[in-house]
Amino acid sequence: MTTGSIHNAAPTASDTYSNFADLAAHEDEGLHWTRECRRVPGSDLAHIAIHGGHIEAGTTEAALACAGSADNYYSFKGIKTGANRTLHVTSTDFDEPQCVDLQSGMARTVSWHGFSGGDKITEVGGLDHDFSYWITVSLQHAGFPVAEAAPERAGSSPLNICNRNLAGRGVQLELSRAQRAAFFMNNDMSGGNRNNVTAEFHRYVEAIQAAYRRLRA
């Protein structure tokens, strides 16, 4: 298990910043980004969205809803008027202190992500294979297309923030743009519409929560 900070000399090729400290030195909290962290005593499950807000739209909303009032929640949110992609720090480099500290006390983690794609699909990755199994079964039972994560989205590195918990393993969910858009009225993922969730959103959330109940049964 790795819980300390990551110090990279250079960012991942597709990223602007190498880690959180690099980002925070160039982007202003409250103006360009915010972070939310809610801890629930007695819960050892965290739903995290490290590319939330306008970075990978819909991931913050999914993480928050799935955590509900019972489980822990974290989101790093892009709030810029444009170019929020510059706030993306890849999962193996993400070391924002509140998230790292939360993860250090968790036995289970679901890390929420988005990727481009015109077909509805959820790719399931990470190192927590037991939880991944039940999430896959539960989503499929609810009618959602599911696939094993593509290699570039597999979440298999021990340095991935989803795996940096007490168990050294978590689940990484990659939701296509089409799937995330279906969570909001008129497929509109703009910031002003992301409070207007659909029945499909609620069905998806229930499937994830049901998977955790089955895991613990």
Model regions and ranges:
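N-terminal catalytic or cofactor-binding beta/alpha core of small enzyme domains
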Residues: 2-217
